[in-house]
């Protein structure tokens, strides 16, 4: 495997997104240090229409990589069908964008990035696709049973909670398996796969649980995915920072050490850990360049997003009581 692609949805406005450009600077600084631009055939940045020109300007700092900035509105017009505030779930919309990657990439395998992840060890395309299959990180399904059960309902399959599943971003996916998921959702529900997912905005499906359950159901996991073998690093470090109180105890030196496991780690953006603290923690291990950027804070938008979250919680509880999936 000579090259892979990458997809990275970016927002700069909203509750958790004000420092996403700075976080992307960290991500690309790590990629610059631990791999080369030639690893990637294309890195697709998918951006809301109103943020496209701004992100294009910031993306010049990453122009040594094969960056393509995509206007979300030109490809995701279906989002407009779900425009009521409680229907707008940015987390789900970004997951749909990730599953839509086959529209924008040509390679069989691609890595999914979020702005808050970064590399911790050297890698190439061959590292991520050993023997022609995607390097995959295990995670027990029963750690998060709700998301596996929600996705299983949409696919009419058993959630298999006693089995391992696919772990979080960054994750390697197959273009072919994404397309097969699109086909299966459309076949079951009789409409565009994206509409199926958008209509179920109050259900906690996720892109990876849907992808993995469908691949398992079709018996295709072993054809397209592989686990790390002895002597190979896993995709994820042994620990990432998922909650703010974990940052103090997170041992960066350990996770960047030559004898440590894992190619990537995460300092989750919704922890509200200051960007400066993240840079201070990581900069001893790779050079980081943070460009000047504007932090957008909109109190009205924040209030609207909070209302949306509260409304969805109520709908989710109601749907759970009814056992409902929307076609």
Range-by-range predicted roles:
Residues 161-254:
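Catalytic core and acceptor-binding pocket of nucleotide-sugar-dependent glycosyltransferases
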Residues 29-39:
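Short, acidic, metal-binding catalytic loop of nucleotide-sugar glycosyltransferases
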Residues 1-29:
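N-proximal low-complexity "stem/linker" segments adjacent to membrane-targeting elements
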Residues 39-50, 69-74:
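Short beta-strand/loop segment that forms part of the nucleotide-sugar
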Residues 1-2, 268, 273-327:
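Membrane-proximal basic amphipathic "stem/tether" segments
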Residues 119-152:
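Conserved donor-nucleotide/metal-binding helix-loop-beta segment in metal-dependent transferases, i.e.
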Residues 110:
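Short aromatic/hydrophobic "clamp" motif used to bind/position activated sugar donors
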